[in-house]
A protein has these predicted regions:
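Short coil/turn linkers that connect adjacent helices within long alpha-helical scaffolds
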Residues: 1-2, 39-43, 77-83, 100
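Short, intrinsically disordered, charge-balanced linker/junction segments flanking boundaries
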Residues: 102-113
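Short, charge-rich amphipathic alpha-helical segments embedded
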Residues: 30-46
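Conserved alpha-helical positions within TPR/SEL1-like repeat arrays
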Residues: 6-20, 29, 45-60, 85-100
Length: 113
């Protein structure tokens, strides 16, 4: 395991801790730093986790467009990695995002995909 990968994991752990306490700005900062490291290392699995966390923080913060973009990137990576369980979770996240926006048809399409 590389130092950068360990740093990414630690930043995501800290971000999750902040998120669970409702400190969304601090959580976002941790996830954004982790994303920098993940992109540098090219670790796709770490990138999936970090982008998913960023999508979640954007979703609860009302930043639907950013959440959508993060989840879409996660979905593409999960398809490349063959992560069927992860794909299901991400499609549900995308569906929930659209349902929260009142876009029932789009939400349904994600849920059924």
């Amino acid at each position: 395991m590389t130092v950068r990968h360990s740093l990414s994991e630690e930043l995501n752990r800290q971000g999750n801790e902040h998120f669970s306490r409702g400190y969304y700005t601090e959580a976002y900062t941790c996830y954004a730093k982790a994303l920098e490291y993940d992109r540098l290392t090219g670790d796709q699995r770490a990138l999936v986790a970090t982008l998913g966390n960023l999508g979640n923080i954007c979703a609860v913060s009302g930043r639907r467009d950013a959440a959508q973009a993060n989840y879409q990137e996660v979905l593409e990576l999960q398809k490349v990695l063959g992560d069927e369980k992860g794909i299901g979770t991400t499609l549900a996240n995308l569906g929930n995002l659209r349902a929260d926006a009142g876009e029932w048809g789009r939400a349904r399409a994600y849920y059924l995909e």
